[in-house]
């Protein structure tokens, strides 16, 4: 009972804090004079991280196994993984474009996890025999870390497409303030442009947009490369575990099939980066398609509750 109460408190603290962080981001986006509030949002993300970490540790202690046995626990872990990605630019002292992706993604995953749809999964249960293995933590954690990483990289690629073709979208048309550009700190370039007007340094209209898209493209490539590596490790660990549990390394289960499709899509993306004719818009399009594939692989199969990987699915639990 004590652990359940602690989990409930920590879960709601993390969700409330990340909601405040999102609000601060929106305020600083609309009111430039309040840019100093960004420090508060970073502190909020730290509070969120420790709250989610405390939740996972508490869940682990109460259940006796790492909390990755159902959709609810995996969503909480996914939120935790998104924060880890959020801190990478901080460590490298780089411009934190990732925060524009990781912060909203964290609140969405956290929000769905705490919604009424997954209430029956909130109580920790004993693992079914097939999941009582040392491979549970290794395989599932690697897969979820890869999902979080690939989702962020895919969204960065989608942002590149929107910036390059924003005139084709009503929301991002020139008649309106381009929220996306401001979100990625594109205002920095306006300051530089105004300072260059009084100098002899040449400039051209699309130079600043080019700098932004190149920076996002670089981040997208690095993040997806990391995610692809984690996905490969996760699939290999799963194959070894499958051989121990079911006597076969690969069964073309729906989850396995979509994991293979996901791996193939991002392998195509990485290969397209080596071809100058595909690098840029074409590779970003491939990565954006990968975003949908990941959600089908991770979320769609769990909702349907089919195949050998249906443990902890929404349908099975709701029955």
Curated annotation (Swiss-Prot):
Main location: plastid
Pfam families: Cytochrom_C_asm (PF01578)
UniProt keyword annotation of Ligase present: no
Bilayer topology term: Multi-pass membrane protein
Domain of life of the source: Eukaryota
Transmembrane annotation, as ranges: 17-37, 44-64, 68-88, 143-163, 223-243, 257-271, 286-306
Molecular function terms from GO: heme binding
UniProt signal peptide: none
Disulphide-bridged cysteine pairs: none
Keywords: Chloroplast, Cytochrome c-type biogenesis, Membrane, Plastid, Thylakoid, Transmembrane, Transmembrane helix
Gene Ontology cellular component annotations, sorted alphabetically: chloroplast thylakoid membrane; plasma membrane
Gene Ontology terms describing biological process: cytochrome complex assembly
Function statement: Required during biogenesis of c-type cytochromes (cytochrome c6 and cytochrome f) at the step of heme attachment.
NCBIfam families per record: cytochr_II_ccsB (TIGR03144)
Subunit composition and interactions: May interact with Ccs1.
Family assignment from sequence similarity: Belongs to the CcmF/CycK/Ccl1/NrfE/CcsA family.
Name assigned to this protein: Cytochrome c biogenesis protein CcsA
Record organism: Lolium perenne (Perennial ryegrass)
């Amino acid at each position: 009972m004590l652990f359940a109460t602690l989990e409930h408190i920590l879960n709601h603290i993390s969700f409330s804090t990340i909601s405040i962080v999102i609000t601060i981001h929106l305020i600083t986006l609309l009111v430039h004079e309040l840019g100093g509030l960004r420090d508060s949002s970073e502190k909020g993300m730290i509070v969120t991280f420790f709250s989610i970490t405390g939740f996972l540790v508490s869940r682990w202690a109460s259940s006796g196994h790492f909390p990755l046995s159902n959709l609810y626990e995996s969503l909480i872990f996914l939120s935790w993984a998104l924060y880890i990605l959020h801190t990478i630019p901080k460590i490298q002292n780089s411009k934190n474009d990732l925060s524009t992706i990781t912060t909203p993604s964290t609140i969405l995953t956290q929000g769905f996890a705490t919604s009424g749809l997954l209430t029956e999964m909130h109580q920790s249960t004993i693992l079914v025999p097939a999941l009582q293995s040392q491979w549970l933590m290794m395989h599932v954690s690697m897969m979820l870390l890869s999902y979080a990483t690939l989702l962020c990289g895919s969204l960065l690629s989608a942002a590149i497409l929107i910036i390059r073709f924003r005139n084709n979208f009503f929301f991002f048309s020139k008649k309106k303030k381009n929220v996306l550009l401001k979100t990625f700190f594109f205002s920095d370039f306006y300051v530089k442009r105004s300072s260059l007007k009084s100098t002899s340094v040449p400039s051209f209209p699309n130079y600043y947009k080019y700098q932004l898209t190149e920076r996002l493209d670089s981040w997208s490539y690095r993040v997806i490369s990391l995610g692809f590596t984690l996905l490969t490790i996760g699939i290999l660990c799963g194959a070894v575990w499958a051989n121990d549990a079911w006597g076969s390394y690969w069964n073309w289960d729906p989850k396995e099939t979509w994991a293979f499709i996901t791996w193939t899509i991002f392998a195509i993306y990485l290969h397209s980066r080596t071809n100058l004719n595909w690098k840029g818009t074409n590779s970003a399009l491939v990565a954006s398609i990968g975003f949908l594939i990941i959600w089908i692989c991770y979320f769609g199969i769990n909702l349907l509750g089919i195949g050998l990987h249906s443990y902890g699915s929404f349908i099975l639990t709701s029955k």
